Design a protein with these regions (language model features):
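Long, low-complexity regulatory tails in eukaryotic proteins
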Residues: 187-190, 198
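Repeat-solenoid scaffold signature
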Residues: 16, 195-198
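Internal alpha-solenoid helical repeat scaffolds
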Residues: 7-187
Length: 198
């Protein structure tokens, strides 16, 4: 990347988006933010670009930046809504077959962060995820349903947890997102141990 001339990168803004995501995955956050500034400069230098294309570029930039806000649902949601408003097509930097949970077997363990705030976090997931699904072709489908079912399980509401689990299984059926299936399977296993379900 260091050997690629800046002017070449500026001529290929979609490549900048993919590189931003790669830098995030490699934990090269300063380089990721440097690429973001390059993308913004490139968009500003090209007023002739169609507004739809600019919206897609800037919206996807917001989507990628949202990962820096993990696991703050409110902060991530602001960027997802911004991306959703600007984008007219699905993101190119995120494949819906890729992992959504970064290997975690639990959505709740990923996003519940403050004691006493679980209801608010669940509501934020319900509000946030449709925007995220819209711009990622359903990547992580069922996350909010799984999180709510896990919350019901932890509250001892085993029947509600089982119903939520079945809803989640139905939501993710056939979408190829194994990581979401594993979250469901993990909850099903816990229910079989603690709730009398098999």
């Amino acid at each position: 990347l260091g050997r690629c001339p800046v002017e070449t990168l500026k001529r290929h803004p979609f490549a900048i988006l993919v590189l931003m995501r790669c830098m995030f995955n490699l934990r090269q956050i300063p380089k990721m933010l440097e690429l973001k500034e390059l993308l913004l400069a490139s968009a500003a230098e090209h007023p002739e670009w169609p507004e739809e294309e600019k919206g897609n570029l800037l919206g996807e930039c917001d989507l990628i930046l949202s990962f820096l806000m993990y696991n703050d649902i409110s902060a991530m949601s602001r960027l997802h809504r911004s991306a959703s408003r600007q984008m007219s097509r699905p993101a190119i930097s995120i494949q819906n077959s890729g992992g959504w949970t970064f290997g975690s077997p639990s959505v709740l363990m990923m996003f519940h962060r403050q004691p006493g705030q679980l209801e608010q976090e669940l509501a934020e997931m319900d509000e946030c995820m449709p925007h995220y699904y819209k711009i990622t072709s359903g990547h992580g489908m069922g996350a909010e349903t799984i999180m709510r079912a896990e919350a019901d399980f932890l509250r001892g509401r085993f029947d509600d947890a089982q119903i939520g689990l079945e809803r989640a299984y139905a939501q993710i059926a056939g979408n190829g997102q194994t990581n979401m299936t594993l979250c469901c399977d993990f909850l099903a296993w816990r229910l079989s141990l603690g709730g009398g379900y098999t």
